[in-house]
């Protein structure tokens, strides 16, 4: 079966995806978007999709945001390394989630801007429709939906989320069960993308769920495994290992490093990425003039149709290859819980 799976990786690129992400200078019609991208599960970037948003000019100024949101309490996510919702690199591997505090926005933004990897990294990434709840004061600076996408999908967004971070924050490989329209307002977002067909290349394993707790008196973090133990299926691959780990990582994960290259795209301020449901994505960022990166994303319900059934069948297959060595099997145990639909860059 290994040969057939490897052929699938190549075939989807030859028949449909190509070698790079399509880009447009103007908004596509709903019909074109639905026919050429949604129906084919194919990402694209629209360069001038949100140039009319007031947020593009206003949000690069920290003084505007802290003034407009001066009395608003928001959810601040804290980690020691900028890797929330990710597999830890420690000897006792687990799926680590951030420590979350409710603080006034001006304080939260100050923590984000002063982030230092290895000590404390702040990220505003609450999800759960946070843009229309925690940040409703500035919601009118953006559109309530992506109009041509709403018409194509036939529904309004289920959730709209706001993300504010620095280059110290990284989102590990994961997938979402949503059609995602990802709009960058300030700075840049850098995406590595893999189609659902490449699921075996990400070495998804079951990891015990854990949570960081942050202690202000000592300015230190503690990682605690949840009780009772709950397992989360997550990718084991870090696509950018440190130089001292690169050789060993390549040996452990040859399907990723020796297979077809992931798609890479940079989404700049004013641009929108269409990220199809169930596509795996890893995200890093470059701050803009305000010293942070800001994005707003729109989650639309995906169709749980035949493509979803095909994906479940594919990921249930054992991958065995004498030449590449790994034996992979992904199964959701009865006590495991997939949270990937709730996590996005």
Swiss-Prot record:
Protein name: Lysine-specific demethylase JMJ32
S-S pairs: none
Name of the gene encoding the protein in the UniProt record: JMJ32
Knockout mutant characteristics: No visible phenotype under normal growth conditions. Reduced abscisic acid (ABA)-mediated growth arrest during the post-germination stage, with stronger effect in plants lacking both JMJ30 and JMJ32. The double mutant missing JMJ30 and JMJ32 exhibits an early-flowering phenotype at elevated temperatures (e.g. 29 degrees Celsius), associated with increased H3K27me3 levels at the FLC locus and decreased FLC expression. The double mutant jmj30 jmj32 has longer primary roots. In jmj30-2 jmj32-1 double mutants, reduced brassinosteroids (BR) mediated repression of ABA-inducible genes (e.g.
Co-factor binding details: Binds 1 Fe(2+) ion per subunit.
Protein keywords: Abscisic acid signaling pathway, Brassinosteroid signaling pathway, Cytoplasm, Endoplasmic reticulum, Iron, Metal-binding, Nucleus, Oxidoreductase
Protein role: Histone demethylase that demethylates 'Lys-27' (H3K27me) of histone H3 with a specific activity for H3K27me3 and H3K27me2, and involved in the regulation of gene expression. No activity on H3K27me1. Together with JMJ30, regulates the flowering-repressor FLOWERING LOCUS C (FLC) locus by removing the repressive histone modification H3 lysine 27 trimethylation (H3K27me3), especially at elevated temperatures (e.g. 29 degrees Celsius), thus preventing extreme precocious flowering.
GO CC annotations on file: cytoplasm; endoplasmic reticulum; nucleus
InterPro entries the UniProt entry points to: Cupin_8, JmjC_dom, RmlC-like_jellyroll
Residues that bind Fe cation: 174, 176, 281
A GO BP entry: negative regulation of gene expression, epigenetic
Cofactors, names only: Fe(2+)
Cellular localization per UniProt: Nucleus; Cytoplasm; Endoplasmic reticulum
Pfam families given in the database record: Cupin_8
Boundaries of every JmjC domain copy: 122-315
Family: Belongs to the JARID1 histone demethylase family.
UniProt GO molecular function: histone H3K27me2/H3K27me3 demethylase activity; metal ion binding
Enzyme class name: oxidoreductase
Annotated EC: 1.14.11.68
Reactions listed under catalytic activity: N(6),N(6),N(6)-trimethyl-L-lysyl(27)-[histone H3] + 2-oxoglutarate + O2 = N(6),N(6)-dimethyl-L-lysyl(27)-[histone H3] + formaldehyde + succinate + CO2; N(6),N(6)-dimethyl-L-lysyl(27)-[histone H3] + 2-oxoglutarate + O2 = N(6)-methyl-L-lysyl(27)-[histone H3] + formaldehyde + succinate + CO2; N(6),N(6),N(6)-trimethyl-L-lysyl(27)-[histone H3] + 2 2-oxoglutarate + 2 O2 = N(6)-methyl-L-lysyl(27)-[histone H3] + 2 formaldehyde + 2 succinate + 2 CO2
Organism per entry: Arabidopsis thaliana
Known tissue expression: Expressed ubiquitously including in vasculatures, leaves, siliques, roots and inflorescences. Present in the root meristem. Accumulates in cotyledons and root tips of young seedlings.
